[in-house]
């Protein structure tokens, strides 16, 4: 297919009761009404969500998401993990929601309902049947394909090669001093899931069917709250996360949390707080504090000590450990001015190959510093300055360093219905390991956090214009120029040159 990306969204809502919509997406390189795709867009998502009709709190048809407890059984939410603010860390999941994004993996397809049994009791039930992408060989599912790309023949060969059925339920009690929940999920593939065995994936989910049961709780007493969840899988292996939160006056938050995710615990759709990306093979202890130390100065800090009982990808040694620590000081004397400085230290054991080809597992240390200044002028002009530094090295080895400086300005015109955002960034890193990432404003629904490495500059312009209350135009143009490269990326995405540009156009119609 041609190299342009585009998507189409239609959404309808009536008050806060009825939501309906369709999302269609074509990734760059995917065929459009041609080749192996005669139906136009590569991905379609339809949904209908109804709220607060009698005893029915929520009814979802089509594509939807569900998340319960603290994610040890099922969670399709996007979360910031340990880097979330302490006030939101450990918030309970939100139950049933519509799936209106272009994510082609984290959703379910079928029906979900939330029914109010009594004043404080709610019962949810959900069913899903969907085709999924994956690599299938010798009647086994070798891996699940989650990126949603269908550009080449080899990618089309992995499209809709397997099916997954899922049924689940959640019983929830919402009391004055406590919240209790019980979640059960059963899901089955049409073929056994059996990844090719590697040293790190011995305990990955394997088999045709999986079921998990978990109980979550939250107790309140004055300014204390105790919360957590414990779950087991079909083999009786368990995972647990428990947190104590103290919230005195003045915006102070003190959190102490422990987690234990057994190396053999298996849940296909679990996602929770941790150093790893799965609820498996990890235990840890976290302590965090957010408080005002002076009139205009707020301090945020945390320390997370973690341990992996079994081997991991690029870690061929069992029983490795690490530390993740953060300290941030924020200064905000007025509504218009805010600045902070942040330092983050992370130490993890990883495999390292020496010059003589010998391999050993030694500590890898990553240090990051950021200074950020936000300044606004009479709700018209907003300025943001960022300076980033990162240093990464294995113990006893030379370090990889990276620097980035960026400046952005957002201006809202009062005589015109126009908002303009400009940004520029200069970066200089030794290699890919010391890459730096910043948030960049884009058009609605397009989340942009580009990573920068080697040497170069990035410039972006974002404009939003309201023709009237029904028509909104938005456009973004960005270009990245590298000073020390004559080729960018590799394989299908390789660019023969030192400049990479991107253009976004969006038209919104509101009725």
Language model segments and positions:
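Beta-stranded membrane pore/translocator domains
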Residues: 2-3, 36-41, 59-63, 127, ...
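Outer-membrane beta-barrel translocator/receptor signature
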Residues: 2-7, 12-20, 24-30, 36-44, ...
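Exposed, low-structure sequence patches enriched in small/polar residues
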Residues: 3-5, 162-195, 202-511
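Conserved catalytic-core segments centered on acid/base and nucleophilic motifs
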Residues: 10, 48, 59, 113, ...
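Outer-membrane beta-barrel proteins
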Residues: 25-43, 97-104, 157-160, 231-233, ...
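Outer membrane beta-barrel
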Residues: 38-96, 100-133, 248-267, 417-432
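Surface-exposed loop/turn segments flanking beta-strands in extracellular/periplasmic regions
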Residues: 80-91, 137-153, 441-446
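Aromatic- and glycine-enriched pocket-lining scaffold segments that form the walls
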Residues: 105-152, 160-162, 166-170
């Amino acid at each position: 297919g041609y190299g342009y990306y585009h998507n189409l969204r239609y959404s309808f809502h009536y008050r806060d009761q009825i939501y309906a919509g369709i999302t269609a997406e074509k990734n760059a390189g995917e065929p459009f009404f041609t080749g192996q795709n005669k139906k136009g867009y590569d991905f379609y998502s339809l949904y209908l969500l109804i709220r607060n009709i009698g005893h029915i709190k929520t009814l979802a048809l089509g594509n939807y998401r569900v998340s319960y407890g603290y994610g040890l059984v099922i969670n399709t939410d996007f979360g910031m993990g340990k880097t979330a603010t302490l006030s939101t860390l450990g918030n309970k999941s939100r139950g049933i929601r519509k799936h209106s994004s272009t994510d082609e993996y984290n959703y379910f397809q079928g029906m979900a309902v939330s029914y109010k049994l009594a004043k404080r009791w709610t019962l949810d039930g959900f069913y899903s049947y969907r085709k999924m992408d994956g690599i299938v060989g010798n009647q086994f599912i070798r891996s699940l394909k989650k990126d949603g790309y269908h550009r080449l023949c080899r990618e089309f060969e992995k499209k809709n090669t397997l099916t997954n059925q899922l049924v689940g339920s959640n019983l929830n009690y919402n009391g004055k001093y406590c919240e209790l929940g019980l979640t059960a999920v059963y899901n089955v593939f049409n073929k056994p899931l059996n990844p090719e065995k590697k040293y790190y994936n011995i305990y990955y989910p394997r088999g045709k069917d999986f079921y998990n049961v978990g109980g979550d709780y939250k107790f309140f007493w004055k300014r204390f709250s105790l919360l957590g969840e414990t779950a087991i899988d079909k083999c009786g292996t368990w995972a647990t996360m428990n947190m104590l939160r103290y919230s005195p006056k003045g915006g102070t938050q003190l959190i102490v949390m422990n987690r234990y995710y057994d190396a053999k615990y298996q849940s296909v759709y679990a996602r929770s707080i941790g150093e790893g990306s799965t609820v498996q093979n990890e235990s840890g202890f976290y302590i965090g504090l957010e408080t005002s130390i002076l009139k205009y100065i707020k301090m945020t800090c945390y320390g997370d000590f973690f341990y992996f009982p079994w081997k991991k990808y690029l870690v061929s040694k069992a029983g490795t450990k690490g530390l993740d620590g953060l300290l941030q000081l924020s200064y905000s004397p007025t509504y218009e001015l805010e600045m902070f400085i942040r330092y983050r230290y992370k130490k993890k054991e990883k495999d390292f190959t020496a010059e003589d080809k010998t391999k050993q597992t030694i500590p890898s240390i990553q240090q990051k510093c950021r200074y950020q200044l936000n300044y606004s002028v009479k709700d018209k002009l907003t300025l943001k300055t960022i300076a980033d530094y990162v240093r990464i090295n294995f113990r006893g080895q030379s370090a990889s360093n990276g620097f980035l400086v960026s400046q952005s300005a957002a201006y809202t015109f009062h005589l015109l219905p126009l908002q303009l955002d400009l940004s520029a960034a200069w970066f200089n890193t030794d290699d890919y390991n010391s890459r730096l990432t910043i948030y960049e404003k884009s058009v609605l629904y397009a989340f942009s956090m580009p990573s920068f490495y080697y040497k170069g500059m990035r410039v972006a312009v974002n404009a939003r214009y309201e023709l009237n209350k029904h028509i909104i135009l938005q456009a973004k143009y960005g270009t990245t120029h590298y000073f020390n490269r004559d080729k960018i990326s590799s394989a299908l995405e390789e660019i023969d040159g030192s400049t990479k540009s991107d253009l976004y156009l969006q038209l919104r119609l509101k009725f």
